[in-house]
């Protein structure tokens, strides 16, 4: 995620299973993994006491994520381990505790309806092909005003941010729009220090943005079923 708000964590990210230096890339199998394939009971890496090696040391983590069998809370914990800025990590740890009591991925019911309708329509295949595209659309559909302004500039494979006019948007919408653009283009208009400041980004908005980060990292499988 070079150039995104998480650029400061790039070196650390390369040490996590499934991430390699960007110059080398990652070889991904075309095989579509299922939950049965990733059942930890059949893992050859379990200890003699049949204990799982855990997310951090799991050699099958990329496959488990692709199969959609890594829980939302587990993805958040992995995300926290990558963060160098302590104030930011502390805020996300708070969100993790809240999510265990009140799990929610979308901003509200209207957001869920908009996004899922696009997903189910079959007219936007890049939702499943491009993590950057999916993360940006996820954010743009979260705000009624932003969606009204942007929907005509989103096609099957691209988003034309330069044509979207956001004059009149509120402060939350402003942060959502620029974070969506950052995740799509790999820019850093919204800094990680700003995301760490609760006076600029409230907890509910931060949760939405973090969920978009998870989509940017893992794709649509990050969205709980």
Feature locations, PLM:
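GHKL/Bergerat-fold ATPase module
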Residues: 184-185
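Extended, charge-biased low-complexity segments
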Residues: 1-167, 189-196, 200-225
């Amino acid at each position: 995620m070079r150039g995104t708000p998480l650029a400061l964590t790039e070196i650390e990210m390369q040490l996590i299973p499934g991430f390699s230096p960007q110059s080398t890339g990652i070889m991904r199998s075309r095989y579509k993994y299922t939950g049965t394939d990733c059942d930890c009971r059949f893992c050859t890496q379990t200890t003699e006491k049949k204990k799982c090696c855990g997310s951090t040391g799991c050699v099958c983590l990329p496959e488990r994520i692709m199969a959609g069998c890594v829980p939302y809370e587990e993805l958040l914990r992995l995300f926290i381990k990558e963060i160098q800025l302590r104030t930011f990590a502390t805020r996300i740890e708070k969100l993790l505790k809240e999510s265990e009591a009140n799990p929610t991925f979308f901003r509200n019911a209207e957001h869920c309806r908009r996004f899922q309708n696009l997903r189910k329509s079959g007219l936007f295949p890049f939702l499943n092909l491009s993590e950057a595209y999916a993360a940006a659309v996820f954010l743009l559909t979260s705000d009624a005003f932003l969606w009204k302004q942007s929907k005509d500039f989103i096609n099957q494979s691209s988003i034309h941010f330069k044509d979207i006019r956001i004059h009149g948007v509120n402060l939350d919408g402003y942060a959502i729009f620029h974070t969506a653009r950052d995740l799509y283009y790999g820019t850093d208009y919204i800094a990680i220090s700003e995301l760490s400041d609760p006076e600029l980004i409230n907890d509910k908005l931060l949760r939405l943005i973090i969920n978009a980060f998870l989509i940017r990292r893992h794709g649509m499988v990050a969205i709980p079923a």
